A protein has these predicted regions:
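Conserved SAM-binding loop
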Residues: 247-248
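Core catalytic lobe of class I
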Residues: 1-237, 242-244
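Class I S-adenosyl-L-methionine-dependent methyltransferase module
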Residues: 93, 252-253
Length: 253
């Protein structure tokens, strides 16, 4: 395990599913309001890091194992976000995970759909333009400790190009279908790099300035960039040495 201390966060080259890394993070941050995770999906992406010989049940159980460990690092009412996909025929670990992860002290509060602009798929099926984000709350209530959800503005009527007659607008709460974030196509820093805005939203909603947010699968380091923009601190954990080295280099001043 390698720990790099930056001015506004911590990067760890290690296995986030290990007790050693968990203990190290807890010693540094104490309990936190938000943990984010974008794990490998398992045989879904045609990349070496996504290959697994596990069945979907075994893969779901692997996810459950580190979820149960890391939920202990959350404050009461803390939020736990996990990215996932519908999978492929015969291999749907994320769907099994959603059912198995919930218990009386860990509630599945919502499943968010990120509606993307680019579609993919095969000719004999509907095209996919979505990705799922499970949102859990620690405790026996679905009410999170912090929920600072911003209102979104929606313009109605004509385009409003005439300054004499500005377009009317109204504000509305964000739904569990996010259509206002454009994805990154073939991210340059990681094959499945998330758009920064889609990472910022949970940080805005569940944390306050100065809070720590923990990312269990650091990847491109997008969570750190989002945290910096919003005045939060971060802990990023990445197992792959090459991905880790690139991530830390990008995050250095």
């Amino acid at each position: 395990m390698i720990i790099d201390v930056l001015s506004d966060g911590i990067c760890i080259n290690g296995d986030s599913t290990s007790q050693e890394v968990f203990n190290a993070v807890l010693d540094i941050t104490g309990v936190v309001p938000l943990i984010a995770s974008d794990p490998p999906y398992g045989n879904i992406v045609d990349e070496s890091w996504d290959k697994t010989k596990m069945s979907d049940v075994q893969f779901a159980e692997w996810m459950i194992k580190w979820t149960k460990t890391w939920k202990e690092a959350l404050i009461p009412g803390g939020a736990f976000y996990v990215w996932g996909g519908l999978g492929i025929p015969g291999f749907r670990p994320f769907l099994k995970y959603l059912i198995l992860a919930e218990d009386q002290e860990f509630q599945l509060a919502n499943v968010i759909t990120w509606s993307k602009k680019r579609a993919y798929g095969v000719k004999h099926n509907y095209l996919y333009t979505r990705e799922e984000l499970a949102y859990f709350v620690k405790g026996n209530s679905k009410k999170p400790a912090t929920f600072n959800i911003p209102l979104l503005e929606s313009k109605r009527g004509y385009s409003g190009y005439n300054p004499k007659y500005p377009a009317k607008s109204e504000f509305y709460r964000r739904t569990n279908v996010w259509m206002d974030v454009t994805e990154i196509f073939r991210g340059k820093d990681h094959p499945t790099q998330k758009a920064q805005r889609v990472v910022e939203i949970p940080i805005e909603v569940h944390t306050s300035p100065g809070d720590y947010v923990v990312d269990l699968f650091g990847g491109a380091g997008t969570t750190a960039h989002a945290a910096r923009k919003l005045g939060r601190k971060f802990v990023l954990i990445e197992k792959d040495p090459q991905i880790y080295a690139s991530m830390v280099e990008r995050l250095k001043p």
